[in-house]
Amino acid sequence: MSLLSDLINLNLSDTTEKIIAEYIWVGGSGVDLRSKARTLSGPVNDPSKLPKWNYDGSSTGQAPGKDSEVILWPQAIFKDPFRRGNNILVICDTYTPSGKPIPTNKRHAAAKIFSHPDVAAEEPWFGIEQEYTLLQKDIHWPIGMALGGFPGPQGPYYCGTGAEKAFGRDIVDSHYKACLYAGINISGINAEVMPGQWEFQVGPSIGISAGDELWVARYILERITEIAGVVLSLDPKPIPGDWNGAGAHTNYSTKSMRNDGGYEVIKQAIEKLEKRHNEHIAAYGEGNERRLTGRHETADISTFSWGVANRGASI
């Protein structure tokens, strides 16, 4: 083992009570993740006991240079699978110095919704299926595909095994275990339909915790792919042509939906979703018009539909 590896895996608890806290937040694109670390005097288990921090928002696309201060408010703590010991990962949201949430802080409004007594009483469950693609670093082409070339057509890769069907499993399994270590309610993984494409599932988790767990799971995956020297892509359609895209399918239920007669409650919710389909699509992220074509197990972006076990439906 090299000296560098020794230092990376150094156990600090033998020599100091101090810990390292990695503060994580969503950057200016609304998709990128940023983080920086600080030393704390001892272990912390309650995010309200953590100090607020600041960063240069002009360097993340979240503030102008003449007024660049953005404040990090710690919101959730997870165990750090990289530094281990008592070290922690901290999910933060972002505010102006006067305490107003900045535009990219979507967590603030979500937390208010989930804390409403009527919402909390329904115990909303989320199960999120995050698809992603692993790309070769220098050419931004899926691992398992030669530059400018393609393997055999889709079919054998979904949940596939073997050197000609599954690419990047070491990264996927490392991520799976790291998430379990961190305390994330990760419920599974599988190879997806396109070579180099995988999925992990978070949940069922209640309310705002589902979002916190998804973002930390994404962060951990970014760190692991950084170590492995490959690029993590959440692009909805990373490769054009006859290949599946990647999304974050969201399974959702309330207590009323899970109780007897819940199927009727589900249908009522679907009717409400249909009425605001275009508004919702606009908020689901950029690039979905390239994925939601009515082909490759998707619904057409302009057409709302629902069904049971229908992979070509919106719901």
Swiss-Prot record:
Its EC number is 6.3.1.2. Belongs to the glutamine synthetase family. Residues 19-99 form the GS beta-grasp domain. This is Glutamine synthetase nodule isozyme. One of its GO terms (biological process) is glutamine biosynthetic process. Residues 106-315 form the GS catalytic domain. It holds the Pfam family Gln-synt_C. Keywords: ATP-binding, Cytoplasm, Ligase, Nitrogen fixation, Nucleotide-binding. GO terms for cellular component: cytoplasm. The lineage of its organism: Eukaryota, Viridiplantae, Streptophyta, Embryophyta, Tracheophyta. Homooctamer. It catalyses: L-glutamate + NH4(+) + ATP = L-glutamine + ADP + phosphate + H(+). It is found in: Cytoplasm. It comes from the Eukaryota.
